[in-house]
Amino acid sequence: MLSHLRPAIVSAGLFTVLLGLAYPLAVTGVAQAAFPAQANGSLVKDAKGTVVGSTLIAQAFAKPEYLHPRPSAAGAGYDASASSGSNMGPLNDTLIKREKTDADALRAENPGVVIPADAVTTSGSGLDPEISPANARFQAPRVAKARGLRLAQVQAVIDGQAQGPLLGFIGQPRVNVLTVNRTLDARFPAHGQKGG
């Protein structure tokens, strides 16, 4: 009977070591060597080395001198542990009321301007760190006014941070909210704050 169990035990032990230890270590090693920033969460640090965010996860920016991310289905604080879509269909009364309230507030701030869809709709995860270039341009006048800048200065930062579709055809053009806001702080500190 032991002769029948021995191959099974050896196979289980071998595959445990191979797939539970060797393979994960190899993948981690390759990732750390080839893509260290991405392998460690695409973290963004300030001048002192303190982590201030990640380019992969949205965070709340409510002040007028900053671009604002998309609304979050994960709560007001963009809580990653609550990440998910709202599962509300397009005819859901709660969703319609929230989007109308958000659109009315944006319309009051920007009369006569077309509101981009992603300014009032959540992403699938609720934590999308990027907005459309149209949404960034929509917010640029508010940011410029709050920082005492010309609109062209803010637009130049947005254009400099804009990314096209992956490989030229996958996805949509996008702007990372955190990187634009960090660049604005570095180049044009708002109301006496230190850049960086």
UniProtKB/Swiss-Prot annotation:
GO terms for molecular function: ATP binding; P-type potassium transmembrane transporter activity. The keyword Transmembrane applies. It is found in: Cell inner membrane. It comes from the Bacteria. The chain crosses the membrane at residues 7-27. One of its GO terms (cellular component) is plasma membrane. Pfam families: KdpC (PF02669). Signal peptide: none annotated. Keywords: ATP-binding, Cell inner membrane, Cell membrane, Ion transport, Membrane, Nucleotide-binding, Potassium, Potassium transport, Transmembrane, Transmembrane helix, Transport. Its main location: membrane. It is a single-pass membrane protein. Belongs to the KdpC family. The system is composed of three essential subunits: KdpA, KdpB and KdpC. Part of the high-affinity ATP-driven potassium transport (or Kdp) system, which catalyzes the hydrolysis of ATP coupled with the electrogenic transport of potassium into the cytoplasm. This subunit acts as a catalytic chaperone that increases the ATP-binding affinity of the ATP-hydrolyzing subunit KdpB by the formation of a transient KdpB/KdpC/ATP ternary complex. This is Potassium-transporting ATPase KdpC subunit. It comes from Caulobacter sp. (strain K31). The lineage of its organism: Bacteria, Pseudomonadati, Pseudomonadota, Alphaproteobacteria, Caulobacterales.
